[in-house]
Amino acid sequence: MSEKTTKFIKTIGVLAQNEYNARKKAILPSVCIAQAALESGWNLAAKSLFGIKGNGFKATTSEFYNGHYVQIEDTFRAYPNVAAAVVGYYDFLEKTPRYAGALNNSNYKDTVDKLIHTTDGAPYATDPNYISKIISIIEQYNLTIWDNKECGNQKSIEELADEV
């Protein structure tokens, strides 16, 4: 694993686990890390780690509509730093009713599925391969070690960071 990838996982992992442990309803840290990696291209300097649309900055993005990818310009939320982006991501998911099914799951595959198959049919992402991409990142980098609240792992965040 590259130094850049290790740093990314440790940085997002610590922040995600802090948010996960502090909230009553939250998404698994492994899913948070994988989404940040996919949406930002493993870039901690990205203004929008999670690709959440909203007021912030305009960028070109690919969306999948009517059976094919199209390039569109859209506006994304921007955050001043990585910590604020992670808090913003957890706030967004917690406050958006369509993602309620993705919160407090102990299984990352079910969690990712519920981000796409939402209660109102508006998925987190339009990419038909989004679920498999997120699951692949989680499994390739063993990101479930960050989900210790659910799996009973009593290791500290620092111990987990050392395992990456």
Enumerate the language-model features and the residues they cover.
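Catalytic cores of secreted/periplasmic lytic hydrolases that degrade extracellular macromolecules
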Residues: M1-E163
